[in-house]
Amino acid sequence: MKKVFVKTYGCQMNEYDSDKMVDVLNASQGLEPTDNVEEADVILFNTCSVREKAQEKVFSELGRMKALKAVKPDLVIGVGGCVASQEGASIVSRAPYVDVVFGPQTLHRLPDLIARRQRTGQSQVDISFPEIEKFDHLPPARVEGPSAFVSIMEGCSKYCSYCVVPYTRGEEVSRPFEDVLAEVAGLAEQGVREVTLLGQNVNAYRGKMGDTTEIADFALLIEYVAEIPGIERIRYTTSHPKEFTSRLVELYGRCDKLVNHLHLPVQHASDRILMAMKRGYSVLEYKSIIRKLRVLRPDMSMSSDFIVGFPGETDADFEKLMAMIEEIGYDTSFSFIFSPRPGTPAANLHDDTPHEVKLRRLQRLQATIEENVQRISQNMVGTVQRILVEGPARKDPTELHGRTENNRVVNFALPGVPQAGRDRLVGQLVDVSITQAFPHSLRGEIVVRQ
């Protein structure tokens, strides 16, 4: 049986796309996924171009594939994702042993690209933007476990000054309303209990409703997803503060299936820097969203993205960022030093801050976030948390593990519960009393209701 190996870089959108690559090749050619690159007949790299480091990792990996290709001349090597969109045919120029190059919007054409490569002997490149076409050509999702990603829109139309996503994934295009609901319903029938709705700016969703001229916004989509039998939890990422409507805020007051956690990237806490980033909101407007949410959900868990060392960032700007991190009490983050991307306006900005200064700022920020994480975890000890059971614990298969609403992994014992009873709990929501907090997980015991 032929096999496909996929290496994924970057965001959850790429994770979703990688799963779809496997689904497409399985449906068309019977390929099964493998974690062993050496036994693969097709090797795909689903790439990210948000930071230079991630991009260079791809070419480093490709270099290692050259020797494997020499031993297995029929091996197919493909590069997809945002680096593929950005670099196109230059990838083949730099690595002639690459067989196919495809963008996020053309992954459904993989079988045809591979067949054309094998027929002509020429490397194939397709990085076009055929809007939402790919979703019409994808086979039904195959899922394992109680959680799944669902892409509801593609692209970005915000054009932040530092970001390449609009150039690599195209403008915002929303999937039709009924198509999203049908995919979620299909997942629920396979046992999925938690869905994460995905988009570069997921709350900018505007989906066409059937044959009418009506458009569904993101809040309406969530309301309908919440009504699908079997779906117990709803997450989404990544949201944009500029698109966080009052309708979406109000939904947190009446939709229990929306988890008590939100990833809302702020990037910075200096209005001057936010303006240079072209983010489209002020610090006050961002804080206002969180204040309104915490009126409805006082213990709402927040996470964010942060960029330090943006051109022109002063010590005073950075202190504003640190103050906001303390004020809001973020629970985890994705934080990075500014990485100038070719073709973006920010790449041309004057930057006179030494790298050592940027590195110290990043280390301080990450240390503060880690302190927040540990404090929040410790405060969960003694509480009862609702856990979605994902399967056996990795270190002790006699126990189970699952996740809290704020994404903490919880390993828990089941005293007196036979193995058959444990197996039946996978995919269920259970109450667990938290007894211990560790750096990256929690421990507890299931609460047995009499």
Curated annotation (Swiss-Prot):
Ranges where the MTTase N-terminal domain occurs: 2-119
Query: Which residues does the record give as [4Fe-4S] cluster 1 binding sites?
Result: C11, C48, C82
Recorded hits in SUPFAM superfamilies, A to Z, give: Radical SAM enzymes
Where does the chain bind [4Fe-4S] cluster 2? C156, C160, C163
Q: Which InterPro entries match?
A: Elp3/MiaA/NifB-like_rSAM, Methylthiotransferase, Methylthiotransferase_CS, Methylthiotransferase_N, Methylthiotransferase_N_sf, MiaB_methiolase, rSAM, rSAM_horseshoe
Q: What EC identifiers does the entry list?
A: 2.8.4.3
What's the record's note on cofactor binding?
Answer: Binds 2 [4Fe-4S] clusters. One cluster is coordinated with 3 cysteines and an exchangeable S-adenosyl-L-methionine.
Q: Which domain of life is it from?
A: Bacteria
**Compartmental location:** Cytoplasm
Q: Which residues form the Radical SAM core domain?
A: 142-375
Per its Swiss-Prot or TrEMBL entry, what cofactor is needed?
Answer: [4Fe-4S] cluster
- Extract the GO molecular function terms from the UniProt entry: 4 iron, 4 sulfur cluster binding; metal ion binding; N6-isopentenyladenosine methylthiotransferase activity
Which keywords fit this entry according to its UniProt record?
4Fe-4S, Cytoplasm, Iron, Iron-sulfur, Metal-binding, S-adenosyl-L-methionine, Transferase, tRNA processing
- List, for all copies, the residue spans of the domain called TRAM: 378-448
Keyword presence, Transferase: yes
The record's annotation in PROSITE patterns points to: MTTASE_N, MTTASE_RADICAL, RADICAL_SAM, TRAM
State the CDD domains in the record: Radical_SAM (cd01335)
Gene3D superfamilies linked: Methylthiotransferase, N-terminal domain (3.40.50.12160), tm_1862 like domain (3.80.30.20)
**EC primary class:** transferase
A Pfam entry, by short name = UPF0004
Indicate whether Magnesium appears among the record's keywords: no
Could you tell me what reaction this enzyme catalyses? N(6)-dimethylallyladenosine(37) in tRNA + (sulfur carrier)-SH + AH2 + 2 S-adenosyl-L-methionine = 2-methylsulfanyl-N(6)-dimethylallyladenosine(37) in tRNA + (sulfur carrier)-H + 5'-deoxyadenosine + L-methionine + A + S-adenosyl-L-homocysteine + 2 H(+)
Q: What does this protein do?
A: Catalyzes the methylthiolation of N6-(dimethylallyl)adenosine (i(6)A), leading to the formation of 2-methylthio-N6-(dimethylallyl)adenosine (ms(2)i(6)A) at position 37 in tRNAs that read codons beginning with uridine.
Annotated family: Belongs to the methylthiotransferase family. MiaB subfamily.
Cite the record's note on assembly. Monomer.
**Name of protein:** tRNA-2-methylthio-N(6)-dimethylallyladenosine synthase
Which gene underlies this protein? miaB
